Amino acid sequence: MRVLGIESSCDETAAAVYCGRDGLLAHAVHSQVADHAAYGGVVPELASRDHVRKLPGLVGGVLRDAGLTPADLDGVAWTRGPGLPGALMVGAGFARTFAWARGLPAVGVHHMEGHLLAPLLEPDPPAMPLVALLVSGGHTMLVQVADFGRYRVLGESVDDAAGEAFDKTARLLGLPYPGGPAIARLAVEGTPGAVRLPRPMTDRPGLDFSFSGLKTAVLHAVEAAGNDQQARADIAHGFQEAVVDTLVIKCRRAIEQTGAGRLVVSGGVGANARLRERLDEVGRASGFTAHYPRLELCTDNAAMIAYAGLRRLEAGYRDDLDFSVRPRWPLAELS
């Protein structure tokens, strides 16, 4: 089965073709980061308009790269949610029209299920059951994965997501959007231990996250630092260590509670080199292995949507011609 995947949930427009026999045949992503950088974050209306402009060309390009025509496809998968309403509608409308015009089955995919399954696109994918850390600009959650489609949310952020905290902290430090890569670069220049920030909710039972208090602590540190550039680098280092420590502590706790021997990490923050380094260290000491998608599949992409869609189409899932989207769609509602 060959499935066309379409992703448009936020500020990346993406298309991909995945084949059940041959794997990922082609994928392409157009990032709008430069367009939104001047605003310090994503402007929903601009994102939607750019999806309209870029999506047809991206789809045509991945079909050419895969050596296929629309007649060679067996299905279409698109991101139904969660995400920005207008951005989701662009992808949904295109995908459903494309599928209807060619008589192809189509299925709407949960964006976070796509991230959860992204590490399975690698040459040596982890076997289920496992625990997944999904960590991005909009979500931070730990999920127990018994099998495909059998998910139990163990914990999630009660306020800001980790990626959102990176973006807000970067803004406080005068760094560009997106904040994650900018803070990681500045953190290299920081002095270890110079700034100690809280590890929220790690001193109590449970697997939920909270990053709003950490952001407040950063604000006070920035105000105290003034224009001292070394102090700002120290804050970036301290902030990154606090987020990484929090995520690592919760991951280890989730592994201990579930007895899983495998952890998958996905989402934009999953590309953070320090997070990967620490999880690998703790995994070796605690007896679990951590698995990650390649860096280009950590951020939003259509390869993960095409793969998740293929799995759902093979399992018999189909959507009708209604292309309603779900901007808010708890993963716990997915079956």
Swiss-Prot record:
Keywords: Acyltransferase, Cytoplasm, Iron, Metal-binding, Transferase, tRNA processing. Its cofactor is Fe(2+). Fe cation binds at H111, H115, D300. CDD domains: ASKHA_NBD_TsaD_bac. One of its GO terms (molecular function) is iron ion binding. One of its GO terms (biological process) is tRNA threonylcarbamoyladenosine modification. Its EC number is 2.3.1.234. Belongs to the KAE1 / TsaD family. This is tRNA N6-adenosine threonylcarbamoyltransferase. It comes from Halorhodospira halophila (strain DSM 244 / SL1) (Ectothiorhodospira halophila (strain DSM 244 / SL1)).
